[in-house]
Amino acid sequence: MSESDIYWTFVTASKYAGSFYQAMGNAGLAADPNNKRRILAAFPEMVATYGAASRLHQTMRAGVAA
């Protein structure tokens, strides 16, 4: 994942996820690069649901309201 993909994964989770993944998205946005990758490695379902391949991620990145 590129740094941009990682950023948008956390932004997408912080907006569209349930409360736990919203908190993880916010934590990821505040984290340093090493801890961002640790969060994503610990929660692969977060990447699957809100990562670059997801429609939500692509919508957020395109700036289209979902």
Where would I find each of the regions flagged by the language model?
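Short, charge-rich amphipathic interface segments used for partner binding and complex assembly
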Residues: 22-56
